[in-house]
Amino acid sequence: MLHHMRTIINASWRYGNKCIVRQFGFSQTYSQLKGRDLLTLKNYSAEEIKYLLWVAADLKYRIKEKGEYLPLLQGKSLAMIFEKRSTRTRLSTETGFALLGGHPSFLTTQDIHLGVNESLKDTARVLSGMTDAVLARVYHQSDLEVLAEEASIPIVNGLSDDYHPIQILADYLTIQEHYGHLKGLTISWIGDGNNVLHSIMMSAAKFGMHLHIATPKGYEPNSSLTEAAKQFSKECGTKLLMTNDPLEAANGANVLVTDTWVSMGQEEEKKKRLLDFKGYQITMKTAKLAAPNWIFLHCLPRKPEEVDDEVFYCPKSLVFQEAENRKWTIMGVMVSLLTDYSPQLLRPTF
């Protein structure tokens, strides 16, 4: 990975009807990410994550607002390997990659059985000779790690049982668009200690964001990742609250977030989980404890037991803006990992 310095002048970033004013400064450092894998945000620095979001915001502005045609991925091909079903990840990746002039190829478990008909090692080497990148949606994080070790092209995590990094990038872009910054905000996660939460835990503190986590007993996030999150919080001077009380977690939060209580592969546990998560539904009672300017996010698909209609469909719910931003952030990731692109939009405030 190459690193270099880029001098820019921070001024105001106008997007739509918003004008985000920033302080003037010079010698902003960012990482050139071409050729990198994106398996987790744990090993991405704050500046690297911010750069991915910057590119996403730039592409959204230039393509959606200005109507530019940017064939940045012309001649590039992407292998999409999906062991798990998907709506938003598949659609955002296929449409986004094609919009930039690239060619995505979708492979299901009927087309490719990772590590079954062919070893992961061999699959990685075959894909490296035929495509420019791989986005894989798998059960086991270890499969992604083997692919990344053996492949000579970027491997992107489209979701695993451990992490969902591209979802969290969309969340951060949505929050930034709404508030104009991320630093100092408090995210409240109320629900299961799952892969989406793990990705928040590995990145929120790097933006200077505080994190409140409420899970039922027995559904806490991974213990080793909890320790890593505590260390990130300590290094970044942020607050990390972990509790079994959803109302305590909601107190003072700027962003209320939840997700499915029954992830893919856990269908047999549904009846037990619905009982164990009783009291964790996000309602206006929950929201009344949050900051006055709270917003609500959910990666979708949503079930009514997770959040009621009053919150889900209210003006403070940004779930559909969040869903759209899945496209722009995956486009930002692909452009960053496959090209030498430099954003034209002035760097947003984070």
Swiss-Prot record:
One GO CC annotation: mitochondrial matrix
Single Gene Ontology MF annotation: ornithine carbamoyltransferase activity
Domain of life: Eukaryota
Record-listed L-ornithine binding positions: 137, 195, 259-263, 298-301, 326
Enzyme class: transferase
Gene3D superfamilies: Aspartate/ornithine carbamoyltransferase
GO BP field: arginine biosynthetic process via ornithine; citrulline biosynthetic process; L-arginine biosynthetic process; urea cycle
Reactions accelerated catalytically: carbamoyl phosphate + L-ornithine = L-citrulline + phosphate + H(+)
Tissue specificity remark: Liver.
Residues holding carbamoyl phosphate: 86-90, 137, 164, 326
EC number from the UniProt entry: 2.1.3.3
Active site: 299
Principal location class: mitochondrion
InterPro entries: Asp/Orn_carbamoyltranf_P-bd, Asp/Orn_carbamoylTrfase, Asp/Orn_carbamoylTrfase_sf, Asp_carbamoyltransf_Asp/Orn-bd, Orn/put_carbamltrans
Subcellular location: Mitochondrion matrix
Pathway: Nitrogen metabolism; urea cycle; L-citrulline from L-ornithine and carbamoyl phosphate: step 1/1
Assigned protein family: Belongs to the aspartate/ornithine carbamoyltransferase superfamily. OTCase family.
Record text on subunit structure and interactions: Homotrimer.
Function of the protein: OTC is necessary for the tadpoles transition from an ammonotelic, aquatic larva to a ureotelic, terrestrial adult.
Protein's recorded name: Ornithine carbamoyltransferase, mitochondrial
